[in-house]
């Protein structure tokens, strides 16, 4: 008799048995569905992860797609487990693992990661006789999706083609004007390689799939355009359209079984092609990205030209409470540029002498046309390496459109006589950020509002970089003078819908010209969110990298499409997965190089960091009642330059003469953040925290370290007595504070024969910490918004900001 199996061996055997039974159960479930169902599900998941639909992919939909792919992977592993692994299966397992890990990272290469994941899964499943054709289709969907999302010039050409086609076909019936995603052209292009291969390789009825797909596109575009569906119905129609396209692809794949038994690839011939694929993908992603030049970190000289500005250069300090959000105020744009290290110059004239030593010229809402001499001066300035930033607004209010188009139309950029309107209350779901800003900024960092759309010509040197996906173009009404020539701001049939360009750039010589159809991003009330974007825009427009980069990136994108198609011609599943992984590596390498951190230095002067990196209960829709624009305006009135910070506080704290305001954080500070915060306060910093008892549990470790806690006694709306304040502020939902002797009460309220502290202060070193027992006192609805202000609460904030620091007894 042999020696008994050790305990760990028995446990391992039991674990293996459980795994086999689990895999067997999944395999039994999937064996009940038709043989084409796994391939159909995989294609569906890939389309959803490619974000090719007009409706942005919701996180829940993305999560379901990843779960479905995981189930298909378990099914494939179960098939191999029961039949026995071979020496070739290790490569498929590696593909599956790499693709699965990358798909959960939510990067620019997510569709390619998913394609590699599916290729590995299909390669492991021995019952998939259509593996070569299926994985070839999957890989090309990932490649086409990545190329369209990484090449703004190519995306613009496809989008203009969709608008022209739908307008030409359906304008006679009052329809047309659909963008690439809304018309279904993006989805058709994703699956087009599969259909083209079917036409090339087929024998009988080879063109039937292509003709059928085109017919589906026309039916979908026509119904979406002519019937003017609501967003909910539009999405349903689009899902049916994509479902039929994918059924067509599955049918084509199953019709190519005779090519399943191709010979193994000659890797000595494939490897050089893969190297070129990696280099081209890296170049396509790197060339148009942010600031690849050596000058990125250097400060710029920025000239703000007042060319009969329709607006004002006022700042919040110039406006009375409640009036800061009325009108177009740009006074803080130069202030933020100066705080970022740039030298700001202002002027009224455009001539060679004035702009000779300038890096960037900024023109906002020009109310007068440009002379030919001014145009030629600006064109020559840009060609020599300068940057030109032109900001306009909706319709032709005040003649802005005529003045702007007279300057930028010869360059292929112009403002439309319309208003670009989001279907959502804000632009958080509607806005799509394209390269060169897609990897560094989110829609929340670019708070656009209602402005004009930008007509970007199809030109190798013209590229959009801000697009409204769920948005429409509402034509202006020249007779509606009382409402600034606006239309009805509602979507009507026949209006341009989907993929509306909001900002674009023209590469010219060694410089760039950027045109925005909306000035909201650069107004004083929005710069607390957009300050990093505007600084990146200033540096990118003036990096002097040359106009050849954009056309060359477009050429690389086209070469990648043709090269990938040739490389995937009749391969096996392994080659398809390797192509997807190599393409992924190139895209990630290019974007990593381009967006690697650049040392531009912190913002200078007294600043106010509004913490948004700890689950703070703040809404980011423009002027939302739970927003913080009013807080930013009041911080500016008190001499601080405010900015919202969405990341952690480690290494991000401003200078000690500044202040940090944390509104209702629901996620705890790390030990490193607590240590850095306390050291920063000791050096002279000021920290203001507003929190109620429900939110204070997240801050318990930090509050315990500094000797304070929030009591679970709801006081409701109260008006406390505040030290050094003649008026009583309004706390909408107050909670009492329990403090150690080091704390001094600043605000207290008498309730039920007891006095409760609701505002307390503690000095630590040269700085101080203030805690307010109310999570919403400094939100817009309780502080300041458009045409209203609670002067008692603005006075409270001013008092807290102006109190001396480093004093032991503030009372």
Give the predicted meaning of each segment.
Residues 2-279:
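Hydrophobic N-terminal alpha-helices or hydrophobic patches in metabolic proteins across all domains
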Residues 261-811:
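Short, surface-exposed patches at the edges or C-terminal ends of soluble domains, predominantly
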């Amino acid at each position: 008799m042999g020696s008994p199996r050790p305990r760990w061996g028995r446990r391992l055997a039991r674990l293996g048995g459980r795994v086999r039974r689990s895999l067997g159960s999944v395999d039994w479930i999937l064996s009940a569905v038709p043989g084409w169902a796994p391939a159909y599900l995989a294609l569906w998941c890939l389309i959803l992860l490619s974000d090719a639909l007009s409706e942005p992919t919701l996180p829940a939909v993305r999560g379901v797609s990843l779960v479905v792919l995981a189930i298909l992977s378990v099914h494939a592993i179960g098939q191999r487990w029961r039949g026995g692994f071979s020496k070739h299966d290790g490569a498929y397992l590696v593909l599956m693992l790499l693709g699965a890990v990358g798909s959960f990272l939510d990067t620019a290469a997510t569709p390619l990661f998913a394609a590699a994941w599916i290729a590995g899964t299909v390669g492991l499943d021995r019952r998939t006789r259509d593996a070569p054709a299926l994985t070839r289709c999957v890989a090309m969907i990932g490649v086409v999706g990545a190329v369209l999302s990484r090449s703004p010039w190519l995306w613009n050409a496809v989008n203009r083609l969709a608008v022209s086609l739908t307008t030409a076909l359906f304008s006679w019936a009052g329809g047309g004007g659909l963008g690439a995603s809304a018309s279904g052209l993006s989805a058709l292009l994703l699956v087009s390689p599969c259909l083209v291969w079917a036409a090339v390789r087929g024998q009988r009825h080879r063109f039937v799939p292509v003709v059928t797909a085109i017919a589906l596109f026309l039916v979908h575009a026509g119904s979406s355009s002519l019937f003017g569906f609501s967003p909910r119905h539009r999405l349903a129609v689009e899902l049916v359209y994509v479902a039929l396209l994918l059924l067509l692809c599955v049918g084509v794949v199953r019709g190519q079984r005779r090519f399943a038994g191709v010979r193994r690839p000659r890797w000595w011939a494939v490897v050089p092609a893969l190297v070129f694929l990696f280099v081209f993908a890296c170049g396509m992603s790197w060339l148009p990205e942010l600031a690849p030049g050596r000058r990125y970190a250097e400060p710029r000289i920025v000239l703000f030209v007042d060319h009969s500005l329709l607006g004002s250069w006022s700042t919040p300090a110039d406006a009375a409470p409640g009036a800061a959000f009325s009108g177009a105020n740009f006074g803080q744009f130069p202030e933020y540029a100066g705080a970022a290290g740039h030298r700001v110059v202002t002027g009224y004239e455009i001539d060679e002498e004035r702009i000779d030593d300038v890096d960037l010229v900024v023109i906002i809402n020009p109310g007068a046309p440009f002379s030919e001499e001014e145009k030629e001066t600006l064109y020559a300035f840009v060609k020599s390496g300068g940057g030109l930033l032109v900001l306009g607004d909706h319709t032709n209010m005040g003649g802005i459109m005529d003045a702007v188009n007279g300057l930028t139309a010869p360059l292929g950029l112009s403002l439309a006589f319309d208003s670009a309107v989001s279907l959502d209350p804000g632009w958080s779901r509607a806005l799509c950020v394209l390269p060169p800003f897609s990897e560094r900024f989110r829609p929340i960092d670019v708070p656009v509002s209602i402005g004009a759309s930008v007509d970007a010509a199809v030109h190798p040197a013209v590229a959009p970089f801000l697009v409204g996906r769920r948005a429409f173009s509402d034509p202006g009404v020249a007779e509606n003078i009382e409402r600034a020539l606006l239309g009805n701001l509602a979507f009507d049939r026949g209006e341009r819908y989907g993929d509306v360009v909001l900002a674009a750039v023209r590469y010219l010589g060694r410089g760039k010209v950027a045109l925005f159809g909306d000035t909201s991003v650069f107004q004083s009330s929005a710069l607390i969110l957009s300050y990093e974007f505007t600084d990146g825009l200033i540096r990118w427009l003036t990096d002097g990298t040359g106009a050849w980069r954009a056309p060359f990136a477009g050429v690389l994108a086209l070469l990648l499409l043709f090269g990938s198609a040739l490389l995937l011609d009749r391969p096996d599943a392994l080659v398809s997965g390797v192509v997807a992984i190599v393409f992924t590596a190139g895209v990630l390498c290019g974007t990593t190089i381009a967006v690697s951190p650049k040392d531009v230095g912190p913002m200078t002067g007294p600043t106010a960091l509004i913490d948004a990196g700890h689950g703070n209960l703040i809404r980011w829709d423009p002027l939302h009642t739970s927003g913080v624009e009013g807080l930013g305006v009041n911080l500016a009135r008190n001499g601080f330059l405010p900015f919202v910070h969405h990341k952690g506080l480690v290494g991000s704290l401003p200078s000690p003469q500044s202040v940090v305001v944390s509104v209702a954080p629901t996620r705890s500070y790390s030990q490193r953040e607590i240590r850095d915060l306390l050291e920063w306060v000791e050096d002279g910093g000021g920290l203001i925290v507003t929190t109620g008892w429900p939110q204070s549990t997240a801050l318990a470790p930090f509050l315990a370290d500094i000797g304070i806690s929030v009591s679970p006694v709801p006081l409701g709306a109260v008006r406390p007595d505040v030290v050094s304040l003649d008026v009583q502020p309004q706390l909408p939902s107050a909670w009492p504070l329990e403090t150690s002797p080091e704390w001094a009460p600043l605000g207290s309220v008498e309730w039920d024969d007891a006095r409760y502290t609701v505002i307390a202060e503690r000095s630590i070193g040269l700085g101080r910490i203030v805690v307010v027992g109310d999570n919403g006192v400094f939100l817009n609805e309780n502080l300041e918004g458009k045409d209203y202000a609670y002067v008692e609460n603005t006075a409270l904030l001013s008092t807290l900001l102006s109190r001396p620091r480093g004093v032991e007894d503030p009372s």
